[in-house]
């Protein structure tokens, strides 16, 4: 029986993970669930899955959760804050950790899980974007297993033999191709993009996701973050990581080899597929996702992304090339910009402009430890906030 900690259990990936776990009660049980502020939803999850521990973001939320659990006669231990998150991520009772907290908040517990030698199911791409060398060093030192959950990276993982994933160029890999739907504004007149509302931006044509990642998809910053993530996961330089727009979202990514072969992973756009793969690897289990019907789909199309339409993608490539703290700076500025857009404080096209301005002002420095990462993150956030009109 595998004991699972789910960091971010009330988010879309967390909910999908619980759906897969519920289908296999003979294989998996829940050790801990965490949420920032969705206390009622977390209490419902605790009632169903009966974790040993539940963690929330604040003391106030913890008190509220405790009342709800007591009313149901549940004996789940309640904690709050970053230290409690790190504790459930590294607990000896836990075998695997689903790292699904969105943004920089997920970095510390993800690192704690890696340092403790867990099987880390990585849905929090920001952990690698902000501190790629630190996380990969922790995995190597502890013997942790890092399983990508993003559908694109999970697809690459499935298309590349395990024996060559850390040295792909030496094993005949020419490049990897990360597919992107193009989001809701792929065909919209570029000159009208500053007029779009956040409600339009979060209406993804293929995937059901949270608001922040949906906006990232609309700007293609999400794909930019995935380029940086792929660099660390598969040890490939930026020029060997190509982004291809694929509106049908059926081909999740591809690996091109020097002999002319291209291997692709196909499937319906449902996060339960990569979650089930990562939970059971190297075995296979049912995810609840039906197989694709290629006859019904009939056509698959691909095109190159336009950096004029998607400047955030170019910013991510620039950050990867700059190295050091540049990706962390970019990520912090993006989180501030996206939240400002969701709060209707800036327009859609101001997102990339704000990020570029922060990246221009803040020089990249070496990343030596988690404290230096957080210092750069804080500075970039303060700078980004100072650029937003009051």
UniProtKB/Swiss-Prot annotation:
GO terms for molecular function: 1-deoxy-D-xylulose-5-phosphate reductoisomerase activity; manganese ion binding; NADPH binding. 1-deoxy-D-xylulose 5-phosphate binds at residues 125, 151-152, 181, 204, 217, 222-223, 226. The keyword Mitochondrion does not apply. Its cofactor is Mg(2+); Mn(2+). NADPH binds at residues 10-13, 124, 126, 210. It holds the Pfam family DXP_redisom_C. The keyword Metal-binding applies. Its EC number is 1.1.1.267. Pathway: Isoprenoid biosynthesis; isopentenyl diphosphate biosynthesis via DXP pathway; isopentenyl diphosphate from 1-deoxy-D-xylulose 5-phosphate: step 1/6. Mn(2+) binds at residues 150, 152, 226. Belongs to the DXR family. This is 1-deoxy-D-xylulose 5-phosphate reductoisomerase.
């Amino acid at each position: 029986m595998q004991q699972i900690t789910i960091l971010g259990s009330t988010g879309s990936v967390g909910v999908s993970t619980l759906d897969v776990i519920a289908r296999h009660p003979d294989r998996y049980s829940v050790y801990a669930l965490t949420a920032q502020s969705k206390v009622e939803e977390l209490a419902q999850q605790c009632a169903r899955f009966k974790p040993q521990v539940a963690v929330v973001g604040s003391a106030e939320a913890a008190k509220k959760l405790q009342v709800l659990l007591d009313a149901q006669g549940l004996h789940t231990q309640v904690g709050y804050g970053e230290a409690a998150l790190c504790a459930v991520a590294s607990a000896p009772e836990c075998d695997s950790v689903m790292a699904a907290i969105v943004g920089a908040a997920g970095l510390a517990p993800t690192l704690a899980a890696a340092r403790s030698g867990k099987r880390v199911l990585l849905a929090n791409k920001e952990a690698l974007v902000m501190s790629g060398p630190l996380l990969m060093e922790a995995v190597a030192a502890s013997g942790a297993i890092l399983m990508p959950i993003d559908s694109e990276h999970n697809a690459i993982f499935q298309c590349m033999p395990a024996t060559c994933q850390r040295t792909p160029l030496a094993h005949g890999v020419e490049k990897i191709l990360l597919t992107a739907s193009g989001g809701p504004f792929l065909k919209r007149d570029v000159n009208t993009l500053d007029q779009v509302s956040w409600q339009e931006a979060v209406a993804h044509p293929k995937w059901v996701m949270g608001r922040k990642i949906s906006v990232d998809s609309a700007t293609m910053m999400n794909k930019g973050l995935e380029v940086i993530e792929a660099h660390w996961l598969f040890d490939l330089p930026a020029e060997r990581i190509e982004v291809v727009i694929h509106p049908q979202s059926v081909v999740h990514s591809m690996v091109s080899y020097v002999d002319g072969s291209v291997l692709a992973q196909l499937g319906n756009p449902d996060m339960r597929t990569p979650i089930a793969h990562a939970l059971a690897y190297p075995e296979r289990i049912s995810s609840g996702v039906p197989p694709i019907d290629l006859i019904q789909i009939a056509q698959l199309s691909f095109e190159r992304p336009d950096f004029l339409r998607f400047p955030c993608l170019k910013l991510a490539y620039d950050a990867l090339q700059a190295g050091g703290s540049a990706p962390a700076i970019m990520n912090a500025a993006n989180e501030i910009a996206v939240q400002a857009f969701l709060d209707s404080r800036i327009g859609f096209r101001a997102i990339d402009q704000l990020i570029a301005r922060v990246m221009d002002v803040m020089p990249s420095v070496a990343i030596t430890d988690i404290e230096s990462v957080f210092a750069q993150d804080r500075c970039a956030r303060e700078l980004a906030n100072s650029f937003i009109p009051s």
